Amino acid sequence: MAAKSSSSSTTTNVVTLKAAWVLPQRTQNIREVYEVGRKLGQGQFGTTFECTRRASGGKFACKSIPKRKLLCKEDYEDVWREIQIMHHLSEHANVVRIEGTYEDSTAVHLVMELCEGGELFDRIVQKGHYSERQAARLIKTIVEVVEACHSLGVMHRDLKPENFLFDTIDEDAKLKATDFGLSVFYKPGESFCDVVGSPYYVAPEVLRKLYGPESDVWSAGVILYILLSGVPPFWAESEPGIFRQILLGKLDFHSEPWPSISDSAKDLIRKMLDQNPKTRLTAHEVLRHPWIVDDNIAPDKPLDSAVLSRLKQFSAMNKLKKMALRVIAERLSEEEIGGLKELFKMIDTDNSGTITFDELKDGLKRVGSELMESEIKDLMDAADIDKSGTIDYGEFIAATVHLNKLEREENLVSAFSYFDKDGSGYITLDEIQQACKDFGLDDIHIDDMIKEIDQDNDGQIDYGEFAAMMRKGNGGIGRRTMRKTLNLRDALGLVDNGSNQVIEGYFK
């Protein structure tokens, strides 16, 4: 059972208008696009159905949230935030991908990829407990999702086995996180007081009504305890009894199967279920714990953050590609970039509307980056399109928006049309010159720019050449691509040669 209460409820504005909407724009009726089928599950706030896309026959899951359950303005905001967070995280390999959102007068519908392998919880029930190797593999995936959330300024707040699904019924199926209905954006150092979560998994500081992202690591520690033993660490016949046990914090490592569980596994659990959130392991530290690393399941070198990964990719693009991405970023829907907006605000600590070098350095440090100042300066220069010395909001969105969004045909056509002012079907030298002027770019070698993209050497860029440029080099890029003068050709060379320092991370 998920709990949700907030001290702000006394000032809540009750929504009385029948025509209140969650999404900023009206959508098609979901039944025009999908055939809604059998019921898959029922949650506290919504019902999930299987649905089939009429055009392709593809199978998806649809979470429908009835508006009659949205009693106040905050409830509507919660659903909108869930949608933003899912868009923000859904490119991660272990997060359920959101396909689209629909709304009518009675409900909001979230269409997601269909995971047919069932809940993690069900597999725990079936097996009783996993081997340490199986548990380590699963908890690594879960904590990678937690690390991804935290690096993006998102706190999940309801981690439990039921919120992780396997994509297939196979033994080696991929585990995916779902249900971000209680998740929130947060800033470093920010504390929360509303009691949310599920009884067995809730952290002691949540019960004390003063908590931050450390509470997610506690919940993951509870999941690990269950993965190894088949029972929760804090158990009682009633919710108040469970909460008392959590606040007491006494762990049982004497009952079966704990005597046969390795000391290293128990050490990790103790450090994840530390009563003090300040000394509790972070998600990053969990992934470096010997029990995980020594099993050769997690890499021995910590992954850099998503922000760093995207900035590195961005630094490998040529100038035209950067301008095109800026054009696309400005056309993305609000729900697609809502999470990035929050991330920008988190890094922009003085709320000036721009990110300075020091703010970028501090922001990267907070997400575990170990870059030298010169490397951070290269990233800053790469993102700072207009060379103002700071990164404004538009530049930040352009530098961090997931590159998969580039490849959508409608976005590429829109960006091409922006540069092709006369609608001739070609981008000419003069048109690029005008675009550089519009973007405040000086000292640009336009001939070299065209030469790099112009495959048939006719001195101009057609749509096919433009689309090819935009789609190339969008994979993981290694550490060496941060050189200030790096161009697209160099970046492609690194990708083709298979750099062994590929940056993956939560924007995968």
From Swiss-Prot:
Binding site for Ca(2+) 2: 384, 386, 388, 390, 395
Binding site for ATP: 40-48, 63
Any single Gene Ontology cellular-component annotation: nucleus
Domain EF-hand: 335-370, 371-406, 407-442, 443-476
SMART domains with a match to the protein in the record: EFh, S_TKc
Binding residues for Ca(2+) 3: 420, 422, 424, 426, 431
Residues binding Ca(2+) 1: 348, 350, 352, 354, 359
Name under which the protein is recorded: Calcium-dependent protein kinase SK5
Organism listed in the record: Glycine max (Soybean)
